[in-house]
Amino acid sequence: MSAPHNVLTKKNPRRGRFAFPRRRVRAGSIDEVVQLLRLPANIANGIHTRHKKCWNDFRGGGGGGGGSRVDGTRAFVDLYGLGYLCNRTNSTLADYLCTLFVAEAYRDACCAQPPAPFPDYNASPPDCRPPLPPQPPCKPNDSELLDRIVRQNDLILNGLNQLCLNHSNHHFELSNILNSIKLQNVNIINQLSQIFDDGVLSGLDEKLSRLIADLDGHFADFGSALDAALAQLQDSLRNDLTNINSILANLTSSLTNINSTINNLLQTLQNLGLGEVGAKLNDVQSTVDRILGVLTPEIVAAAAAAAAKRAH
């Protein structure tokens, strides 16, 4: 496969900023790469400016003549910029462009030639000019080096393909999630529209106001009934407590009267002299016993035996 001829590249023979030896930095046209890969025109805005050059930059470095017909504002990118652009699509053409770019850079490094000097318009006559030094011959291509480069490029391309695949998978997952969210939003909007169309929410304020008014009326009635029940309960408790106090007062007075009666009875018994009456009764009983012993001794003996048994 040959390189596409419409991919314009330019060599920059300037020395690197890190004091590397003189080398040629290859750059590719942004417009033609974007056109080949069918990318949007503004995708190059994501490339840092240090990886982009214009035609005037190459001319300032001695890479082009004053009679070039190429547009001076035309932009170019280095290997990093080309990799950035090729990573935005998943195609064999992007892989081929990266491989061709690296291969040409290695080939130029192997076959490096000093840049052609600018013509000296104030030079001396031809007889007085010193002879030009001979140009070194181009080194032959080293197949082993190229094979190694090919393997490295394959590894790089495999990594880029894997990154592109992962990016595509993540993009697909995010797209599915966004689509599901959009579908849910559409369903919710449709349901809300259906609710508003059916007029379900039209009389909701009135219904809620009526319900609140009914609840307020029920709560007021319940409060009144509860207050009446509590007042009635208080009256009943008050009456019951009054009756209990009356009963306790009556009991207290009755106990006081009973106590007074008992005291009076005790006083009366003390005044009667029961001790003398008992002594007189004992005398009468002893007299009767003597009479009975004289008249009926058997009865007296039986009574004495019964008394002895009771004593045992």
Curated annotation (Swiss-Prot):
Disulfide pattern: none
GO terms of molecular function: structural molecule activity
Any Pfam family matching the protein: Baculo_PEP_C
Record keywords: Membrane, Viral envelope protein, Viral occlusion body, Virion
InterPro entries documented for this protein: Baculo_PEP_C
GO CC, alphabetical: membrane; viral capsid; viral envelope; viral occlusion body; virion membrane
Annotated compartments: Virion membrane
Main subcellular location of this protein, as a coarse class: virion
Role noted for this protein: Major component of the polyhedra envelope.
Family of the protein in this entry: Belongs to the baculoviridae PE family.
Name of the molecule in the record: Polyhedral envelope protein
Organism name: Lymantria dispar multicapsid nuclear polyhedrosis virus (LdMNPV)
